[in-house]
Regions:
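Dinucleotide-binding Rossmann-like beta1-alpha1 core, especially the glycine-rich loop
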Residues: 1-68, 199
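Flavin (primarily FAD) cofactor-binding/catalytic cores of flavoenzymes
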Residues: 100-103, 112
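Short beta-strand segments that buttress and anchor functional surface loops
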Residues: 82-83, 130-134
């Protein structure tokens, strides 16, 4: 958490067009599993890890303000905590990072499919020979180092590389989000499903082409996924689960404008108990595993897991792992201070 709070502070400073602080509300009801004292202790810890700065402080929302909380159910409501966290459009942030890298000299091959990589036989001199397909044409290129950052496809990509590196056992966890009609004026709400007490967030959402937040983003679910990541899609049961949670706290039956699903990569726990309930995924540590083909002179690194907030810190760790294999060059920029602009 400390790392994510540090990286959040950098993003707020370097990418104000893309990342902004939002008030988060945690309502606590008589039947809530997490009691007020426990949440308060957690928020104190959160504030201390963030240096007790203005952006990590929290408060109890006075009873007289409850009526302003976007129609939040007040029956049985005991207290409401408010704290701050950052919100971004993940696709826009990713495009901004890509554009920044390109401006600094990176070559991007989008809409391409990795086919295979062979070599290098001599770790000191040879290069990887890479084959890829772009616009129905096969191409080749060479590389001193391969970083496999293929997310849920990481082990599929690794299997196409001529290497002795072993794959890391992972679980793929599907998360579905719904885009709902409506507006949330006050901020983001941390809700707990009445069915299994899993966290679900309801937040203001800006649709593509619109100047301000005009919808609600609701999510997410956690469903074990097997199969081809390319065909992941929202399940009817997931949509029902999310709508049920929203109605429990806001009464109205929302109109679903859109739904989408993605996959998280979780390294397998030591206890591979197949009967564990799905809501235990929420409690699992979302660690990032960096697997190399050798310790001393790595030429291949695969990334498993990770969080968007810490993408820059993860990249620094990747470079540290690969430093013995990289040429001795002066950096062209410092990502701790490099501005990120919203892509046009």
């Amino acid at each position: 958490m400390r790392e994510c709070l540090h990286e959040r502070a950098l993003l707020l400073k370097n990418a104000p067009e893309l990342v902004r602080l939002q008030p988060f509300f945690i309502p606590v009801y008589k039947d809530s599993v997490r009691r007020p004292w426990l949440l308060r202790a957690g928020l104190i810890f959160y504030s201390l890890l963030g240096g007790a700065g203005q952006d990590t402080r929290f408060r109890r929302v006075p009873h007289c303000e409850w009526a302003t909380l976007d129609g939040l159910k007040t029956t049985g409501l005991q207290t409401v905590f408010q704290y701050q966290d950052a919100q971004t459009d993940d696709a826009a942030l990713t495009r901004a990072v890509m554009a920044s890298a390109q401006a600094l000299g990176a070559q991007l091959k989008t809409q391409s499919t990795f086919i295979a990589a062979s070599g290098p036989e001599n770790r000191q001199k040879d290069h990887w020979q890479i084959r890829y397909r772009q616009h129905e044409q096969e191409h080749t290129c060479t590389a001193n180092i391969i970083v496999n950052a293929a997310g849920p496809w990481a082990n599929d990509v690794l299997a196409r590389i001529a290497t002795t590196a072993k794959p890391v056992a992972v679980e793929l966890v599907q998360g579905t989000h719904l885009v709902l009609d409506g507006k949330l004026e006050q901020g983001i709400y941390y809700l707990q499903s009445p069915r299994d007490q899993r966290p679900v967030f309801a937040m203001p959402w800006q649709l593509t082409g619109e100047a301000e937040a005009s919808a609600i983003l609701l999510g997410t679910t956690e469903t074990r996924f097997t199969g081809n990541p390319a065909v992941v899609h929202p399940l009817p049961a997931e949509q029902e689960y999310l709508v049920e949670t929203y109605r429990y706290y806001f009464s109205a039956t929302p109109k679903i404008r859109a739904a989408f699903a993605g996959l998280r990569v979780l390294p397998m726990p030591d206890d591979k108990n197949e009967n564990k309930s799905e809501n235990q995924y929420a409690a699992r540590q979302r660690e990032t595993v960096l697997q190399t083909d050798c310790a001393n002179l790595p030429r291949l690194l695969t990334i498993y897991g990770g969080k968007l907030t810490a993408y820059r810190a993860t990249a620094e760790k990747v470079l540290q792992k690969l430093q013995n294999s990289l040429p001795d060059k002066a950096p062209v920029a410092d990502t701790r201070t490099l501005p990120l602009k919203r892509p046009v």
